[in-house]
Amino acid sequence: MEYVFVYGSLRKGFWNHEPYLKNSKFIGKGKTKEKYAMYVNIIPYVVENEKISHIVGEVYEVDEKTLKRIDCLEGHPDYYRRKKVSIILDSGKEIEAWLYFYPESCGILVESGDYKDYRG
């Protein structure tokens, strides 16, 4: 089993959650330990090399099959690239989870790091 940190359409209440994560174990809400930049250009994405805000999201425990399905959705490794990062859960616990990064910035910056704050 692996942990995956989701910050956009895979979060509960968004369009990709049910098809991809409805059977996965919810670990908790949290944010990245390090700062990154979130942009929206139709869909949200996070850029690793810009240090603007902690990214807000949810952590799920996923099996290999689910991780591969998410890789396919995200176009890993050709579109998004996943990398393990430290996540601080709202409970205070720190865990390592996969996060999908986009290689370049474009679109509208979400300064809060929370896709739910985007009003595009």
UniProtKB/Swiss-Prot annotation:
Q: Name one GO molecular function term.
A: acyltransferase activity
The residues annotated as the active site are E74 (proton acceptor)
Gene Ontology cellular component terms for the protein in this record = cytosol
InterPro entries xrefs: AIG2-like_dom, GGACT, GGCT-like, GGCT-like_sf
The alphabetized UniProt keywords are: Acyltransferase, Transferase
Q: What are the boundaries of the signal sequence?
A: none
Entry binding sites for substrate: Y7, G8, S9, L10
The record's EC number reads 2.3.2.-
Enumerate the CDD domains for this protein: GGCT_like
Q: Which PANTHER family match?
A: GAMMA-GLUTAMYLAMINECYCLOTRANSFERASE, TROPONIN C-AKIN-1 PROTEIN
The text of the family note is: Belongs to the gamma-glutamylcyclotransferase family.
Q: What does this protein do?
A: Putative gamma-glutamylcyclotransferase.
Protein name (database record): Putative gamma-glutamylcyclotransferase MJ1514
Native species: Methanocaldococcus jannaschii (strain ATCC 43067 / DSM 2661 / JAL-1 / JCM 10045 / NBRC 100440) (Methanococcus jannaschii)
From the broadest rank down, the organism's phylogenetic lineage runs: Archaea, Methanobacteriati, Methanobacteriota, Methanomada group, Methanococci
